[in-house]
UniProtKB/Swiss-Prot annotation:
GO cellular component terms, semicolon-separated: extracellular region
Alphabetized UniProt keyword annotations: Cleavage on pair of basic residues, Disulfide bond, Secreted, Signal, Toxin
Subunit structure as annotated in this protein's UniProt entry: Monomer.
Phylogenetic lineage: Eukaryota, Fungi, Dikarya, Ascomycota, Saccharomycotina
Chief localization: secreted
Location relative to the cell: Secreted
Described function: This toxin kills sensitive strains of yeast.
Protein name, as recorded: Killer toxin
Disulfide feature: C45-C55, C48-C108, C64-C94, C85-C102, C103-C109
Gene3D superfamilies assigned: 2.60.20.20
Record's signal peptide: 1-19
Record GO terms (molecular function): toxin activity
Amino acid sequence: MKVSLVYGLTCFLDATSSALPSAMAAANSESSALEKRNDGYLVMCKNCDPNSGSCDWKQNWNTCVGIGSNVHWMVTGESNGQQGCAIIWEGSGCTGRSTTMCCPGDTCCNINTGFYIRSYRRVE
C-alpha cells in the first residue's frame, strides 16, 4: 500500500507541475482576503521558507479545487488549528480515490520532489 501511495503522489506531482504557475496566479488575488479574515488555509508551492512564511497559492479550508486534468485537492483542518491536511483526489471532483497529506500548524513540510505544503493555524 505504501508503494501505491508514493507512486500515486509522484504521479500527482508530475501531473501538477505544469499546472502550478497558472493555479498560483489565479489564487494570488485572493490571498489578502484570506489573511484579513484570519481564516485557516494551506499552501502548496515549490519554494517554502518556514522562517519568513513565504509561499504562494493559499486556499480556503474545506473547499475543492481542480489542478490540471483529473486532479483535485481539498483543504481540511482540525478545529484547534494544530494541523492542515490536503486530500488529493484522483478523478473529476473531490470524490473517489484519494490520498491525504498533513502538515503541523505554522510549519513547512516537504511532501515530495521539491513541493511543499504549509499549513497555518486556523483562527476560530
